[in-house]
């Protein structure tokens, strides 16, 4: 039995040596093999950390996660089970799962493991506590982000508050410099903004987005890609707030100095470093959501984007302009819808599906602006492409038939509407079943059209019968009088 185990162990070691000693093409020289096998753990740890950073920056996320896992194992070998360095390795792994792969639950579990290690870690009195404080700060921040992604808003808020409080204490004690504190604040403020917005509390989110943008512009530059995310989310909050045009206009007229020229050419703008009586935060013009989107778009275009990135950026502006509901913004919305679609018009696969989705939004925009015939024409032309991209029995094709049916109804073409809605309900029955709300609603419309058609048919038959009766009935003269002839 012992001999069998020894043989198995020997075989396993041979496999390990073979795996280490052979690259994808050539065998590593013996000297390098010995270096790889007998390299001290701390040197291996340092190499793994560097490789994790390299893979992350080159967007090779799977390899980056693998290196972070190795870092945890090597840190345990180097420092033991209850050293703060192991907690730091778990925090880095949690950040990797959260930021690189979007796996919030795994990130939460690793962050909680790091918290447990820090709570039980044993350090010598002479050890510099700054590194431990920084590790704790990143732990609270990462755990807060993970809980936010899991929509556990109360727990997320508690951890973000701890991170913010600790960062202020570290700044006051000289553990971090002001520039480092501002960078930390930009992340924390953005997280708080997203936390409030995730609960549909746009009013509370608004000032945090403004602070996040301010700090991000200081640390990353105004034209950085990091600013794009904040600008877009800020624009979304401004739209959700309803814009408050009347209140802002009144405040502008009574309180503010001469307005500065609006970058879009409007005459409704005024300087921003003032407090709005509506929101009690730094005021931004009512069209500012669109301004933010255009700023973000210019940043994207300056970075030599791919067609997909350019399309996404233009699409954001089109949505912002369309959502404003203002007549002056219609041309802007159409311009950026067209720009977005042009960027990916000839794409295939997933991007082709994105093009068709944007095209549908554009058609909805055209319908709301009274261009219903143009919208219907585009939808009719898109049917073949949608069948090719999504299949005959797909939600996208069903919705297109529904929209075309409604367009025919609006034009009084009941027979055309009936035919298109009939196709729509067939697809919906296949996708969702005959008792689904969508299917039942479409079927109800079809039944109503059928009744109208039947009623119209009966009415026509009745009219024809009356006409036939009147023309075939004999013409009798008055009693005692003969008919008058032409001669008479």
Curated annotation (Swiss-Prot):
Q: Which InterPro entries match?
A: TPR-like_helical_dom_sf, TPR_rpt, TTC23/TTC23L
TPR repeat positions in this chain? 45-78, 137-170, 186-219, 228-261, 398-431
Q: Which UniProt keywords apply?
A: Cell projection, Repeat, TPR repeat
Membrane spanning stretches: none
Q: Where in the cell is it found?
A: Cell projection, Cilium
Biological process terms in GO annotation = positive regulation of smoothened signaling pathway
CC annotations in GO: cilium
Protein role: Participates positively in the ciliary Hedgehog (Hh) signaling.
Oligomeric state and interaction partners are given as: Associated with the EvC complex composed of EFCAB7, IQCE, EVC2 and EVC.
State what protein this is by name: Tetratricopeptide repeat protein 23
Q: Which organism is it from?
A: Mus musculus (Mouse)
Q: Species lineage, top-down?
A: Eukaryota, Metazoa, Chordata, Craniata, Vertebrata
């Amino acid at each position: 039995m012992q001999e069998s185990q020894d043989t198995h162990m020997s075989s396993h070691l041979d496999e390990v040596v073979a795996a280490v000693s052979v690259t994808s093409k050539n065998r590593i020289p013996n000297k390098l093999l010995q270096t790889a096998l007998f390299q001290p753990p701390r040197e291996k740890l340092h190499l793994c950390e560097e490789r994790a950073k390299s893979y992350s920056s080159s967007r090779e996320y799977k390899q980056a996660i693998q290196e972070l896992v190795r870092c945890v194992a090597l840190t345990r070998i180097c420092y033991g089970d209850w050293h703060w360095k192991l907690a730091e390795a778990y925090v880095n792994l949690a950040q990797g799962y959260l930021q690189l792969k979007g796996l919030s639950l795994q990130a939460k579990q690793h962050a909680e493991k790091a918290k447990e290690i820090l709570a039980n870690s044993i350090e010598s009195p002479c050890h510099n506590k700054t590194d431990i404080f920084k590790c704790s700060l990143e732990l609270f921040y990462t755990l807060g982000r993970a809980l936010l992604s899991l929509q556990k808003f109360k727990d997320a808020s508690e951890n973000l508050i701890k991170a913010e409080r600790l960062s202020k204490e570290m700044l006051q004690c000289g553990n971090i410099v002001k520039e480092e504190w501002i960078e930390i604040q930009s992340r924390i403020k953005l997280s708080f903004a997203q936390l409030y917005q995730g609960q549909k509390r746009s009013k509370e989110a608004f000032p945090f987005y403004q602070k996040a943008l301010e700090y991000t512009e200081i640390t990353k530059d105004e034209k950085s890609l990091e600013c794009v995310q904040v600008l877009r989310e800020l624009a979304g909050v401004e739209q959700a707030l309803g814009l408050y045009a009347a209140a802002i206009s009144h405040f502008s007229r009574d309180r503010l100095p001469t307005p500065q020229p609006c970058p879009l050419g409007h005459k409704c703008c005024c300087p921003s470093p003032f407090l709005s009586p509506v929101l009690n935060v730094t005021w931004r013009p009512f069209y500012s959501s669109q301004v933010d989107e255009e700023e973000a778009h210019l940043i994207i275009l300056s970075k030599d984007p791919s067609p997909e990135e350019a399309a996404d950026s233009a699409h954001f502006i089109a949505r912002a302009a369309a959502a404003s509901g203002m007549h002056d913004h219609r041309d802007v919305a159409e311009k950026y819808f067209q720009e977005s679609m042009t960027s990916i018009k000839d794409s295939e696969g997933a991007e082709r599906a994105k093009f068709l989705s944007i095209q549908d939004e554009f058609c909805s925009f055209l319908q709301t602006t009274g261009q219903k015939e143009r919208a219907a024409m585009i939808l009719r032309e898109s049917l073949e492409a949608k069948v090719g991209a999504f299949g005959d029995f797909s939600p996208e094709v069903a919705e297109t038939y529904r929209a075309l049916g409604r367009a025919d109804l609006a034009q009084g073409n009941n027979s055309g509407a009936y035919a298109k809605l009939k196709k729509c309900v067939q697809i919906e029955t296949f996708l969702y079943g005959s008792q689904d709300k969508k299917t039942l609603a479409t079927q109800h419309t079809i039944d109503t059209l059928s009744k109208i058609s039947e009623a119209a048919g009966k009415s026509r038959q009745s009219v024809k019968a009356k006409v036939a009766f009147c023309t075939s009935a004999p013409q009798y003269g008055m009693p005692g009088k003969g008919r008058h002839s032409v001669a008479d």
